[in-house]
Amino acid sequence: ETEKFDENKDYESSKYFKHMKNKVHVLGPGEVVLSSNLIINNTEELVVKPGTTILLADGVSLLTKGRTIFDGKPENPILVKRLDKDKPWGVVAIHGPMSKGSIIKNVTFSGGSTSFLENRLFSGMLSISWTENFFMYNSTVEKNVISDDTLHVIHSSFKISNSHFRNCFGDCIDFDYSRGKIRRLKINNSKNDGIDFMRSDVDASHIKILSAKDKGFSIGEMSNIKISSSEVDASEIGVAVKDMSLLEI
């Protein structure tokens, strides 16, 4: 059963991890410069403290295979951005079953791309893969380059709410083989689709998509999607349903 996410709850990292016996890596607060890839293995956890700015060098990625909390606060958010404004970083990836229950809240990710790590291609600047109970709240993901997806969720369960995706190089969000809920999202200026679904089961409400160069919602490959209280404006196509998919509006 999917854990219920209380958006108003203060996920204090020390309390959240107190029952864990694994090693916990802590980044921040303040500036953290990553000049080479940081990989957290599946027997460890990662906490990023409120008020942290992570500066990633050219092509550098953060891959975490254990449970992860980006513990930003509204008044003390987390920033993940380029060390050099002209050189994109790679990806932030949360991957694998031991990362179950990871949380991203009050974070802005900008200026990443794509990466090939440990014999796996991560196509989203922010990549969530093969995990369960992923939660993202009150965050912004923007200004990626090269990569097909700004946020890519694959083989995972999730809830994503109160977040903004903009200036996307390809699809702003790509859900593959995943299931979950999305609430109160703003999606602006995607060069391809606003949201692309493949073999996914998603309940979406209060989604606003503006200026998708292709489709606002692209629903394909036997997906089962419910959309309510949502709108698509200034886009090439509002909603496309194909490949034996089901859409309830």
What are these regions (language model features)?
Residues 1-249:
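Beta-strand/loop edge motif enriched in small/polar residues
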